[in-house]
A protein has these predicted regions:
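Boundary/junction segments of secreted and surface-exposed precursor proteins
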Residues: 26-32
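Aromatic-Pro/Gly-enriched surface loop or interdomain linker
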Residues: 22
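Extra-cytoplasmic beta-strand recognition segments
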Residues: 35
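Aromatic, loop-rich ligand-recognition surfaces of beta-strand-rich domains
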Residues: 2-19, 39-112, 116-172
């Protein structure tokens, strides 16, 4: 968890030194995690690690459009994940996918099934219950426009999803 602080000024312009907590931000356990994929679009630097680097301007992309491409994320430590959010590359495709969670990387529990998804959404939030999760696997099952499995960012939060910056929301 993180806490945002703000300093305030009085009407006379005097700055108060006291910090006041203004919001509690849930931890994104995926940021800085390790990531592996079934394939990567290496000629364009679209590596698996980009999906968890906290930068919405870098992305992972599979090296081909076939179903069955996957992205596996391993957190530094296990966490009780309540919400995930995927920021897909394209805003004009209905991505079909599943998400699984695991505490050991061997035994998987499906937490999201969008394998028959028909909704066109670039940003897909999901409320889940994945206690003690250390691994997540996103499996791409295709899309409505035959685009490849490709996402800007995968987020996994221990609390409510924070709002996305307006710039990101506008792009979606």
């Amino acid at each position: 968890r993180g806490i945002l602080y703000a300093k305030y000024q009085t009407g006379s312009g005097e700055r108060k030194k006291k910090n006041n907590a203004v919001a509690s931000v849930p931890k994104n356990a995926a940021t800085g995690a390790s990531a592996k994929a079934s394939s990567e679009e290496t000629n364009k630097n679209n590596f698996a690690k980009n999906a968890v680097d906290g930068n919405p301007r870098t992305r992972w992309c599979a090296a081909g459009g076939g179903a069955g491409q996957w992205l596996k994320i391993e957190f530094k430590e296990a966490a009780d994940i309540q919400n995930i959010r995927i920021l897909w590359e394209k805003n004009n495709a209905a991505y079909r996918y599943t998400v699984e969670a695991s505490s050991d990387g061997k035994n998987w529990k499906q937490v999201v099934d969008q394998s028959k998804n028909k909704d066109v959404k670039q940003i897909t939030p999901h409320k889940i219950d994945a206690k003690g999760a250390k691994f997540f696997r996103i499996t791409f099952h295709g899309s409505s426009t035959d685009v490849w499995g490709s996402l800007w960012e995968f987020e996994a939060h221990t609390g409510p999803l924070p709002e996305l910056p307006r710039k990101v929301m506008k792009a979606a």
